Amino acid sequence: MAKSRPHIILSAAVSIDGKIATHLGESNLSSKMDLIRLHQLRRVVDAILVGKNTINVDDPLLTVRHAKGKNPIRIILDSSGTISANSKIVKTANKISTILVVAERAPRNISKLGKKGVEIIRCGRDKIDLKKLLNILQKRGISKILLEGGGITNWYFLKEKLVDELILTVTPYILGSKDAISLVQGEGFGKISKSPSFKLKKIERMKNEIVLYYAS
């Protein structure tokens, strides 16, 4: 039986102590080799998905630059519709397909982003309904999504058991701090028996980094 949602791959670069960003928000952990690997992955998926914090803090383009290939659709989850119109992703929305997903309660004036080329999908009353959203995306022909965080967005997908693959690049840094951003934020699982479990499929060494490939 075919899945009613796209295949989800969560990919992230983490420090030795499991952080994806410092307490000041710096997140450029990957080496050039790992960026090439990531961009090779980006070019074979239908869409890249991130949360609003990733846009607000990192202001990424989410394009394919370190490898040859087409740019995937860019999807941003932002329940309240607070993404900045001056972000790189909005400024390039007329050239690269970009979807902003908001909750029904989001203000109507976010429609102005539509004039900049951003498609807006309302999904869920007070917060975004992930399962409903993925069903919508599947019907639109989006069958493979690369989830690139951040920690809160990763949590919601893992909580709903919506992650099929996990690719982690362990970088040679230790960031420390209780305020640094972990791979998975949110409320967390109180019991190990309730948490999702993954099978380690492959280990790849790239000089001073290790890439771990897991499947659900």
Give names to the regions the model predicted:
Residues 1-216:
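Enzymes that bind and transform nitrogen-containing heteroaromatic metabolites
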